[in-house]
From Swiss-Prot:
GO molecular function, one term: inositol diphosphate tetrakisphosphate diphosphatase activity
Underlying gene: siw14
Cross-referenced Pfam families: Y_phosphatase2
Location(s), subcellular: Cytoplasm; Nucleus
Organism superkingdom: Eukaryota
Name under which the protein is recorded: Inositol diphosphatase siw14
Site residues (Transition state stabilizer), renumbered to this chain: 195
SUPFAM superfamilies to which the protein is assigned, alphabetical: (Phosphotyrosine protein) phosphatases II
PANTHER family per record: INOSITOL PHOSPHATASE SIW14 (PTHR31126:SF48), TYROSINE-PROTEIN PHOSPHATASE (PTHR31126)
Organism: Schizosaccharomyces pombe (strain 972 / ATCC 24843)
The UniProt record lists the keyword Nucleus: yes
Length: 287
């Protein structure tokens, strides 16, 4: 029998149903006239809360990995509130997704997103940029080239100008993600698969995740269109001292936080987190 845990993201009530190693996250449906910031009532039926994804929580000594393992991937992406391919990198700190639409902005507001980092080539519309300004959201546009046309045999070559450019953009993005002044932050590209997957894979490398776990997470968001060139980049990513020093704030928050990050029994040998070890409250830094 499944166990239901209320999972509070600020004022947005999300119920999580656990069945062994998987959890299904349900978000109360909100009409176009309702605000995601309003207090939500308890979920009492399937009509009141439609599951939008199935998640698998994997733990490592440095954090939690949340992976969409839905049998029907469209269930998650069709939610009117949640951006496509949405994922939690570190609760209350770093999130990932495909490019959010205007219909997703209320959900992002409920997470108290302070910064949005876009890796797309395309710019947001003037209307969207005005929304960011109005709601005091920092916005960074890092036009990272896609990996679709790059050759596998040159992905690790520092002499290749395309790869050198990607290296520089990845490091700039990681610096923004690790800057606590930007938290909570949403990272996205067009579909939240490849460019976003590369950056998050490199972040996991900084946090000493095993290569296999990094690749598993990348594939879970990009399947069935995972790219060997991306996987090779994640495998071969090498850090530098400036990035290592920027990890201190993130590691400090993870170790000191009273949110679920501090309450999960973390073990790299047993990566699955049992639902009973997850604290009910996920808060933003400083809340």
């Amino acid at each position: 029998m499944a166990i239901v845990f209320p999972f509070q993201l600020e004022k947005k009530l999300i119920s999580i149903t656990s069945d062994r190693d998987q959890i299904s996250m349900s978000i109360p449906e909100v009409s176009s006239h309702d605000s995601c910031l309003n207090d939500c009532h308890s979920v009492n039926s399937e009509e009141q809360a439609k599951p939008v994804c199935c998640l698998e929580l994997n733990a490592h000594k440095d954090g939690i990995k949340v992976v969409d393992t839905s049998n029907d991937a469209s269930t998650f992406s069709n939610s009117p509130l949640v951006p496509d391919n949405f994922g939690v990198v570190y609760p209350g700190i770093i999130y990932r997704s495909a490019c959010p639409r205007a219909s997703n902005f209320n959900f992002l507001e409920s997470l108290h997103i302070r910064t949005i980092i876009s890796l797309r080539q395309e710019e947001y519309s003037e209307e969207d940029l005005h929304y960011f300004t109005k709601h005091h959201i920092n916005y960074y546009h890092i036009a990272m080239p896609g990996s679709k046309h790059r050759k596998n045999d040159c992905i690790s070559s520092s002499s290749n100008p395309d790869i050198s450019d990607v290296d520089d953009l990845v490091r700039k993005t990681l610096q923004l993600l690790l800057n606590k002044e930007n938290w909570p932050v949403l990272l996205h590209c067009s579909r939240g698969k490849h460019r976003t997957g590369i950056v998050i894979g490199c972040l996991r490398a900084l946090m000493n995740w095993p290569v296999g776990n990094r690749l598993q997470e990348y594939i879970s968001f990009s399947h069935p269109k995972e790219r060997e060139v991306d996987e090779e980049y994640i495998q071969n990513f090498s850090s530098d001292p400036s990035l290592k020093s920027s990890l201190n704030d993130l590691k400090r928050y993870i170790s000191d936080s009273s949110s679920e990050l501090a309450d999960v029994v973390l073990s790299s040998e047993s990566p699955t987190v049992q639902a009973a070890t997850v604290n009910e409250t996920c808060r933003s830094p400083g809340s």
